[in-house]
């Protein structure tokens, strides 16, 4: 018996990186999962791998109609919804404000925020009625960039900070029917895409030169995470039996970013 036996989840951005790791872990814990993503080939591959434990919905989280359709498909296939996981996001390749041309700013801002903030809110809005009925939960993927500077550029860090407010306000608005929590991963070996056109060097996060070494050296645990290492937190927060009184909380899964200290001391194995 898994922690999520017979539960139903909807995961956005579920075709790669942390998203697909969550989907696989939820299935292993006994859940049925609806997976929303933009890439038809990746959705098909995940469906072939996991069979009738999942359904897939191709769509764009920035569009209300697509979020509504994903929830409707979940209810049609599985009869209810217990957990909504907002996970879709894009990166900004550490682009500073003064490196964004003024004539490009509005487009870049709207593109990133439409996915990284608006997409979470639209998904939450679409899922609310079903989650009220099941007295379920919402879980949002944040980042250590939701709390600290330097983990991205101005747009990414601002958007992730905004999600802290989203979690707190939704937890307030939706109580006592729906629990709302988040997971804030640190540096992770994930192919999260950078915003197209924002930076001529933009590549997936795990292909940025020096990313893994630099990020590992910055935290006390001295390594970056694989996507699977974060998934236990999503299982815990979705579990009524184990987190039934947990709401408005964010679990940090970042290798100890907060306790880096102000000096240059190196953490060594003993």
Model-derived features: positions:
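Residue(s) in the substrate-gating loop at a strand-loop-helix junction
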Residues: 143
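Catalytic Tyr-X3-Lys loop
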Residues: 101-121, 139, 156, 163-164
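Short, small/polar-rich loop/turn modules that mediate ligand/substrate recognition or access, typified
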Residues: 175-179, 245-247
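Alpha-helical segment proximal to the catalytic Tyr-Lys
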Residues: 129, 171-176
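The beta1-alpha1 cofactor-binding region of Rossmann-like NAD(H)/NADP(H)-dependent oxidoreductases
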Residues: 40, 59-70, 228-229
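Conserved glycine-rich cofactor-binding loop
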Residues: 8, 15-17
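Conserved mid-core segment of classical short-chain dehydrogenase/reductases
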Residues: 90-110, 152-155, 264-269
């Amino acid at each position: 018996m898994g922690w999520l036996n017979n539960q139903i989840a909807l995961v956005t951005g579920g075709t790669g990186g942390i998203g697909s790791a969550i989907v696989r872990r939820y299935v292993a814990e006994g859940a049925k999962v609806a997976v929303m993503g933009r890439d038809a080939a990746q959705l098909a591959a995940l469906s072939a791998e996991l069979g009738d434990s999942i359904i897939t919905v191709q769509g764009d989280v920035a569009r209300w109609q697509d979020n509504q359709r994903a929830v409707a498909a979940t209810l049609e296939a599985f009869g209810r919804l217990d957990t909504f996981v907002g996970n879709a996001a894009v990166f900004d390749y550490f682009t500073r404000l003064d490196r964004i041309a003024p004539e490009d700013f509005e487009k870049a801002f709207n593109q990133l925020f439409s996915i990284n903030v608006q997409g979470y809110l639209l998904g939450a809005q679409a899922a609310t009625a079903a989650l009220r009925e099941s007295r379920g939960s919402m879980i949002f993927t944040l980042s250590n960039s939701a709390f600290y500077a330097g983990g991205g550029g101005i747009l990414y860090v601002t958007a992730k900070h905004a999600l802290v407010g989203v979690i707190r306000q939704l937890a307030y608005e939706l109580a006592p029917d729906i629990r709302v929590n988040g997971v804030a991963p640190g540096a992770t070996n994930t192919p999260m895409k950078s915003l197209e056109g924002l930076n001529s060097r933009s590549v997936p996060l795990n292909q940025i030169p020096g990313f893994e070494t630099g990020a590992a050296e910055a935290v006390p645990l001295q390594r970056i995470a694989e996507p699977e290492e974060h998934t236990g937190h999503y299982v815990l927060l979705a579990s009524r039996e184990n987190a039934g009184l947990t709401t408005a909380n964010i679990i940090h899964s970042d290798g100890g970013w907060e306790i880096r200290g102000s000096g240059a001391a190196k953490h060594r194995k003993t």
